[in-house]
Design a protein with these regions (language model features):
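N-terminal ligand-binding/catalytic initiation module
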Residues: 1-153
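Solvent-exposed alpha-helices and their adjacent loops that cap or buttress functional pockets
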Residues: 12, 55-60, 96-97, 122-124, ...
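Glycine-rich phosphate/diphosphate-binding loop of Rossmann-like nucleotide-binding domains
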Residues: 74, 79-99, 157, 161, ...
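General beta-strand structural signal in soluble alpha/beta enzymes
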Residues: 105, 131-134, 155-158, 189, ...
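A short helix->loop->beta-strand "cap" motif at the edges of active sites that frequently abuts
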Residues: 152-153, 208, 275-279, 300-301
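Adenosine-phosphate binding glycine-rich loop
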Residues: 158-159, 178-180, 284-285, 289-326
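Long hydrophobic segments that form regular secondary structure
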Residues: 243-244, 248-298, 311-312
Length: 326
């Protein structure tokens, strides 16, 4: 049985990866009277007097909504909210296993920015935080911004910030292995969606001055056509040398490659054209931009992917549970 068949078999066996288990003991009529009516009225009254007491008398303090519209799921693209549900359930499992955070999937049947914002804001009183997941750019930037303005709980777009955090952490350690200095490194970020933009912003903030972004059409510059508003903003702080061309041109002489894009788009020849002891984070899922063995054979010093079955996994699972746990 291959891995794909095994994954389907296990998901069919689980019939869902999460469930709700009662924290309250319900063994006697007295237990029932405290957990539900009439005893439940007392915390209701207290919360009605001070809504912040919902964090004390309910599980809200530990509950996170994992929200998607299914428009940018893994490397699969726009597959819809129902098809995104297995990923959201898996995300909730990771929240619980690694942060003891209770997370619930909310897969919404709309791609309208304002409808998503309204839906989440109306549900915000049930949760202590919101994790936005697998929403396509540039709508994800608008949704996050608007929710932060109208909600009084933390709003976190993991595809942006969680990914950026683990990429920076991995690069910091890769620099130690290679002896490279951030000030001298040329960085290429391939993928100009939510993850690529957030990664670039964080690397710039940390002090990497030489970053070139690429998309499906190649190097992004101020003269590139068909850029969205966020990508246009990024041209003001990246590719300051005014490079033009394709991804292969961007990688010539580069020290670091960060891929959040598409499978099998980096060739061994491209890796060989990079500087000595190159660092490659090929994080397209489920198939990376280049397989680790090919990258290493072509001369890369440090290679990471987003997959747990390869060494050096660069995946936001090592960040978001702890971020929400606090």
């Amino acid at each position: 049985m291959d891995n794909k068949e095994f994954a389907l078999q296990e998901h069919e066996k689980w019939a869902g990866k999460i469930e709700v288990i009662s924290r309250a003991k319900l063994e006697t009529p007295e237990d029932l009277a405290v957990c539900y009516t009439p005893g439940v009225a007392e915390p209701c009254i207290k919360i009605s007097e001070d809504v912040n007491l919902s964090y004390k008398y309910t599980r809200r303090h530990n509950m996170v909504a994992v929200v998607t519209d299914g428009s940018a799921v893994l490397g699969l693209g726009d597959i819809g909210p129902e098809a995104g549900m297995p990923v959201m359930e898996g995300k909730c499992c990771l929240f619980k296993a690694f942060g003891d955070v209770d997370a619930f999937p909310l897969c919404v049947r709309t791609k309208d920015v304002d409808e998503i914002v309204k839906t989440v804001s109306l549900l915000a009183g049930s949760f202590g935080g919101v994790n936005l997941e697998d929403i396509s750019a540039p709508r994800c930037f608008e949704i996050e911004h608007k929710l932060k303005e109208c909600c009084d709980i933390p709003i976190f777009h993991d595809d942006q910030h969680g990914t950026a955090i683990v990429v920076l952490a991995g690069i910091i350690n890769a620099l130690k292995v290679t002896g490279k200095k951030k000030e001298d490194c040329r960085v290429v970020v391939n993928g100009a969606g939510s993850a690529g933009v957030a990664i670039t912003k964080l690397l710039l903030t940390y002090g990497f001055p030489h970053i070139t972004m690429c998309d499906i059409n190649g190097i992004i510059s101020k003269d590139s056509p068909d850029l969205n508003w966020m990508q246009k903003e990024m041209t003001k702080v990246t590719n300051l040398e005014g490079r033009i061309g394709l991804l292969a041109d961007a990688l010539k002489g580069a020290d670091i490659f960060v891929g959040v894009s598409a499978p099998n788009i980096v060739t061994p020849e491209m890796v060989a054209s990079m500087n000595q002891d190159a660092i490659l984070f090929a994080m397209a899922n489920p198939v990376p931009e280049i397989m680790p063995d090919l990258a290493k054979a072509a001369g890369a010093k440090v290679v990471g992917t987003g997959r747990s079955d390869f060494p050096n996994q660069v995946n936001n699972v090592v960040a978001f549970p702890g971020i929400f746990k606090g």
